[in-house]
């Protein structure tokens, strides 16, 4: 099954997954009047802005509890887009972000961010071939104090992910999560009856549940086949 079809099937089937106990408190006036919270928000968007104005005008910012899937073929710029957006959120809006990189190391991501922010040559940055002025410029980069938390745990399971999100939310009140990328996650348990497509669908369902539990948007990068 093509990855595109799998994602569409997941989105259609979210409601059909096992129901959770009803924990709604109907005595809460704000739950009956959700617009009151938005009315108190004086910013242009009631979600987390991406920093890309054309996109934010459509989405009104990434909304709490949303699961956003960004899918594209290999080498189309998914990570570059996610990093650019992360930079905007953490520096321009000072909102804490948790970035889970299952492919690249935290060091590689930091180098890419520094190169993009400073305009320095990426290769020179990696090799340490910098002038004293360039080193001083890096030391004063706004990225050094940005509320960005990178986790590069490989083959991350859903259980591990939830535990890390809970810790980040409690300690740093993160406002958004990025996962790079979906196909490198796992459920943490082996089921011979479940094929790869079913496992991906189950992971997505679990991620949606986590987004709702912690009331924050989760952005998932997903690779699709070049044949799609």
What are these regions (language model features)?
Residues 57, 88-173, 187:
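Cytosolic-facing regulatory segments adjacent to core modules
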Residues 75, 104-107, 154-157, 182-185, ...:
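Conserved nucleotide-binding/hydrolysis micro-motifs of P-loop NTPases
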Residues 1-21:
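Accessory, often N-terminal, substrate/partner-engagement and coupling regions
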Residues 88-91, 198-220:
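Substrate-engagement module of ASCE P-loop NTPases
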Residues 15-120:
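The Walker A/P-loop phosphate-binding site
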Residues 158-174, 191, 205-214, 226-228:
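C-terminal regions of RecA-like/P-loop NTPase motor modules
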